[in-house]
């Protein structure tokens, strides 16, 4: 079994497909000569744009809310990014809600990562447990207490 190195895209794509593809291409150029000895994955984050930002702050002028809103991709845009990435990397994704879990399964990601902030989100974890059949699961526990 080869070691796995995961590149975190997060919101670094800034909601721009061309920028996302540029980042993916640069990661690929850095890694392609090591593929025989190391597995590489690119990790994305899925959030349901309809529910992730609470309606009470959705129209806020808060710069963090406004910046975050610019990072959402449509399903069609995600498909383009996945197709572009699939031949270069294994695919990993952190879903932050139930809609996103369903989309991770539909999009056939190799790995599903549970974010440390979701490590005690029991409704999300139970939703995952009932649906995940083939994905490998990675769980972050950073910041969790020993009891958690």
Where are the regions that the model predicts?
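Short, glycine/charge-rich beta-strand/loop segments that flank catalytic centers
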Residues: 95-102
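Active-site-adjacent beta->alpha loops and helix N-cap segments on the catalytic face
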Residues: 16-18, 73-78, 102, 114-134, ...
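Catalytic domains of carbohydrate-active enzymes, especially glycoside hydrolases
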Residues: 22-46, 107-108
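Conserved, mostly hydrophobic/aromatic
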Residues: 8, 27, 104
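Glycine-rich anion/phosphate-binding loops
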Residues: 14-30, 76-77
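Alpha-helix-loop-beta-strand connector modules within alpha/beta enzyme cores
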Residues: 55-89, 126-141
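Glycine-rich, proline-tolerant flexible connector loops at the mouths of alpha/beta enzymes
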Residues: 11-15, 36-73, 100, 116
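Hydrophobic faces of well-ordered beta-strands that scaffold small-molecule active sites
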Residues: 3-7, 40-44, 91-94, 112-114, ...
């Amino acid at each position: 079994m080869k070691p796995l190195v995961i590149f975190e895209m997060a919101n670094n794509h800034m909601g721009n497909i061309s920028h996302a593809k540029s980042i993916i291409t640069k990661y690929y150029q850095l890694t392609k000569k090591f593929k025989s000895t190391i597995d590489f994955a690119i990790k994305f984050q899925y959030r349901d744009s309809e529910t992730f930002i609470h309606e009470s702050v959705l129209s806020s002028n808060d710069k963090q809310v406004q910046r975050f809103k610019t990072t959402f991709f449509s399903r069609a845009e995600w498909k383009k990014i996945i197709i572009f990435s699939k031949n270069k990397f294994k695919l990993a994704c952190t879903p932050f809600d139930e809609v996103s879990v369903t989309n991770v399964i539909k999009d056939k990601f190799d790995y599903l990562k549970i974010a440390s902030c979701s490590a005690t989100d029991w409704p999300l974890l139970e939703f995952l447990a009932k649906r995940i059949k083939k994905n490998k699961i990675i769980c972050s526990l950073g910041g969790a207490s020993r009891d958690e």
